[in-house]
Swiss-Prot record:
One of its GO terms (molecular function) is calcium ion binding. One of its GO terms (cellular component) is cytoskeleton. SUPFAM superfamilies: EF-hand. The gene is S100A9. Ca(2+) 1 binds at S23, L26, H28, T31, E36. Homodimer. Preferentially exists as a heterodimer or heterotetramer with S100A8 known as calprotectin (S100A8/A9). S100A9 interacts with ATP2A2. S100A9 interacts with AGER, and with the heterodimeric complex formed by TLR4 and LY96 in the presence of calcium and/or zinc ions. S100A9 binds quinoline-3-carboxamides in the presence of calcium and/or zinc ions. S100A9 interacts with amyloid-beta protein 40. Calprotectin (S100A8/9) interacts with CEACAM3 and tubulin filaments in a calcium-dependent manner. Residues 135-156 have a biased composition (Basic residues). Disulfide bonds: none annotated. Residues 94-156 are annotated as: Disordered. This is Protein S100-A9.
């Protein structure tokens, strides 16, 4: 019997499943082409990418930036960089919107969730929310414990 997944594990699985909901539609089943990426951004990230959501040129620019091997499609590894950047930007936004007070507090992020305190101390970075280039070219292999493509709610 498997242990119940933690909230973070469930969230990671949700990201993978949503990627696959869009990646299987057109082209290669495990990559996002431009049309699939645009649909994913518009439907799944409406609050995080409000400005870019309705601007096709901005969506195309984000995709080009993420497409590190310049094959006009996004692998999961390329796509997850967007998730990481949005997570960092939302965390910074939570610090910027936190009510003044002692300790390490969080206000609403771009998704309007999160409030309260967390266990860390210190002041937040006052960096920008630019989703531009950060650390391209760092590939990895699944090494036998990545996700499989059989039996997880998508067919090939």
């Amino acid at each position: 019997m498997e242990d119940k997944m933690s909230q973070m594990e469930s969230s990671i699985e949700t990201i993978i499943n949503i990627f696959h909901q869009y990646s299987v539609r057109l082209g290669h089943y495990d990559t996002l082409i431009q049309k699939e990426f645009k649909q994913l951004v518009q439907k799944e990230l409406p609050n995080f990418l409000k400005k870019q959501k309705k601007n096709e040129a901005a969506i195309n620019e984000i995709m080009e930036d993420l497409d590190t091997n310049v094959d006009k499609q996004l692998s999961f590894e390329e796509f997850i960089m967007l998730v990481a950047r949005l997570t960092v930007a939302s965390h910074e936004e939570m610090h910027n919107t936190a009510p003044p007070g002692q300790g390490h507090r969080h206000g609403p992020g771009y998704g309007k969730g999160g409030s309260g305190s967390c266990s860390g101390q210190g002041s937040p970075d006052q960096g920008s929310h630019d989703l531009g280039s950060h650390g391209h070219g760092h590939g990895h292999s699944h090494g036998g414990h990545g996700h499989s493509h059989g039996g997880h709610g998508h067919s090939h």
